[in-house]
Amino acid sequence: MIWVAVIITMLLFILVAKPTGIYLEKAFQGSKTLDKVFGPFEKLIFKITGVKAYNQTWKQYALSLVLLNGFMIVVVYFIFRLQGVLPLNPAHIEGMEPTLAFNTAISFMADTNLQHYSGENGLSYLSQLIGITFLMFAAPATTLALVMAFIRGLAGKELGNFFVDFTRALTRVFLPIAFIAALVFVALGVPQTLDGAVTAQTIEGAKQSILRGPVASFVSIKELGNNGGGFFGANSTHPFENPGQMSNILQMMLMMLLPTALPFTYGRMVGNKKQGRILFVSLFMVFLLGFITITTSELNGNPALNGMGIEHVQGSTEGKEVRFGTVFSSLYATVTTAAETGAVNTMHDTLTPIGGLVPLVNMMLNTVYGGVGAGFVNIIMYAIIAVFISGLMVGRTPEFLGKKIEGKEMKLIAVTILFHPLLILGFSALALSTNLGTDAISHSGFHGLTQVVYEYTSSAANNGSGFEGLGDNTPFWNITTGLVMFLGRYFSLITMLAVAASLKEKTVVPETVGTFRTDNSLFGGIFIGTIVIVGALTFFPMLVLGPIAEFLTLK
């Protein structure tokens, strides 16, 4: 029965992808999509803010994005620091320590949601609502806006205006869907209140303080925007965030909704729907491979316990919630790292070595399917590399969407693709070379190495999940992961926007018999091969020293 439920869940991922992709294309191409509802509201926003809907250059678009995001980071930083004297603080929580406030503000603006604090004890309601929830809308709206400009550039059109795209992302996508999802979560038992903690008496006669809050609205945008941060420290393992299997499936659907839709949006906007389908199918195959790998490993149990003769009918159940089971916990772990969300319904630090390898590889690739917007930019980056390599093999100038890929574009892409591993491996080496980093490790040996690399991989990929055995709430970890999140977020977005702007200016080369097609299964295979060879092999030495070595030595 459990496998039937898994198949139905997978089918739901597929069935909602195309309609959502079509809606996104209409929403950002100026077609009528609920204009009577949102049109007046948008016009009012533009009038108040003074936004003029003129087309921007790629530099203007990128500068607008960075300045707005930077302003939000500063405002939210001071909210976190001053929350102790601000209203809506029934638990009388004190202001955040400076480096933790720095880390948290960047984390949520970068759509990472890495949390070095426990949500229910570290933030007031005001900080949760005005700081965290606000950024949970603003961060994915930023990247969804940028990816639309990116696709327009690839299609040879004007990039558009960042502030218009940002507003449309909020009003046409995130606010309405999150509102509906929040109502469903309330119906499924997720609390939504501004009241303080309630005191309950246990069956043993002791008193217990049960924390609650505006959880349903928080969870809806947490998953839809691929944010992932938890209202509670236990994230989606907490019964108030994720009461049962229905809420569990809904959360996974929300996580996958926009990342799986973007290939279809892209296909329609560039006039090549088949290429969009090829990208979707190719990535879904990689996703399935990851799910099968982690599930097989978790169902086989822990080798150390197996050697003691302990039965593992349910597989490796350490760190997992009984109400979800091993299979759905494995699916959730695959989804949350494939869609770069970072929400967890199981503790990733307790996964088997190969089980923990899959989320790690998903984040290292950062392209299956990736988070809202940012992940799709990486998908196209790998697609262009696949075309470039194919062109070199047959001695032709590579072309993508009928435009020649030349030195300028490949230099930008080369720098971008190297920057991700440099962030991860460089900062991991720094942490391992100083006591400031190694003192946080709770496990010696191979697993300790994986803890460190997972933290920086999650930060660079804007995922936010962690091997929580790592004691990361220290100035060293707060500052270094904050820098990695910021650089990992904005560098690739800006460089790839420059690539799209460069391609926009080029004339379309007429298609000939020798043109390498990017809308067939051959390209799909080369695309997957490029992701594996260029992406995965970059990190292979580290994977051998970490989870693979742990797997081979665990008895």
UniProtKB/Swiss-Prot annotation:
It comes from the Bacteria. It is found in: Cell membrane. GO terms for molecular function: P-type potassium transmembrane transporter activity; potassium ion binding. The chain crosses the membrane at residues 2-22, 60-80, 130-150, 173-193, 246-266, 278-298, 374-394, 412-432, 483-503, 525-545. Its main location: membrane. GO terms for biological process: potassium ion transmembrane transport. It is a multi-pass membrane protein. Pfam families: KdpA (PF03814). GO terms for cellular component: plasma membrane. The keyword Isomerase does not apply. Keywords: Cell membrane, Ion transport, Membrane, Potassium, Potassium transport, Transmembrane, Transmembrane helix, Transport. The keyword Isomerase does not apply. Belongs to the KdpA family. PANTHER family: POTASSIUM-TRANSPORTING ATPASE A CHAIN, POTASSIUM-TRANSPORTING ATPASE POTASSIUM-BINDING SUBUNIT. HAMAP family: KdpA (MF_00275). Part of the high-affinity ATP-driven potassium transport (or Kdp) system, which catalyzes the hydrolysis of ATP coupled with the electrogenic transport of potassium into the cytoplasm. This subunit binds the extracellular potassium ions and delivers the ions to the membrane domain of KdpB through an intramembrane tunnel. The system is composed of three essential subunits: KdpA, KdpB and KdpC. This is Potassium-transporting ATPase potassium-binding subunit. It comes from Bacillus cereus (strain ATCC 14579 / DSM 31 / CCUG 7414 / JCM 2152 / NBRC 15305 / NCIMB 9373 / NCTC 2599 / NRRL B-3711).
